Regions:
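Hydrophobic transmembrane alpha-helices of multi-pass small-molecule transport proteins
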Residues: 44, 120-136
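C-terminal transmembrane-helix exit sites in multi-pass transporters
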Residues: 103-122
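Hydrophobic/aromatic residues within transmembrane alpha-helices
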Residues: 23, 32, 85, 111-113, ...
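Helix-helix packing/entry segments at the starts of transmembrane helices
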Residues: 31-38, 80, 86-106
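Hydrophobic residues within membrane-embedded alpha-helical segments of Major Facilitator Superfamily
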Residues: 5, 12, 19, 74-77, ...
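Membrane-interface interhelical linkers
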Residues: 1-8, 27, 40-68, 79-88, ...
Length: 137
């Protein structure tokens, strides 16, 4: 089932890039990011209340809170950079560079989370990097 959700994420991320590029025209990128974030906030809390999972807030550990907040800060920084890049660059070039996050995530998963880094992972990272460079240079 994880694959279905991951594929859905990829489809929606692709739509996000195109919709954002169209919507950001003539709008300050920081303001556009704030508007997008407000929509995401409303949608996320709507899902929490729709599914009745708001009661789980009290059970979240301090460690989880810390890393969720850090993740939120990283997301905010990512979105601010992404929207500015989209505003000044072509979506067909910005998006592939943004997707280098896959390579960075695999490296961090290996170093921080001690996940296995196989020959298959290395080849995949090399292909993603080469494809990105081929596309944007």
């Amino acid at each position: 089932m994880w694959f279905v959700y991951a594929l859905g994420s990829a489809v929606f991320a692709a739509l996000t890039s195109i919709l954002a590029k169209i919507g950001i025209e003539g709008v300050n990128s920081t303001l556009a990011t704030a508007i997008r974030t407000a929509v995401v906030l409303l949608m996320s809390w709507g899902m929490v209340f729709l599914t009745g999972t708001q009661t789980g807030i009290a059970e979240i550990s301090r460690r989880s809170w810390l890393f969720l907040v850090l993740s939120g800060l990283a997301t905010g920084a990512s979105w601010l950079c992404y929207y500015h890049a989209l505003q000044v660059g072509a979506a067909s070039k910005v998006v592939p560079v943004d997707k280098l996050s896959v390579v960075i995530t695999l490296a961090l998963a290996f170093v921080v989370l001690h996940e296995p880094f196989t020959a298959k992972s290395l080849i995949g990272c090399a292909l993603i990097t080469a494809g990105t460079l081929f596309r944007v240079l």
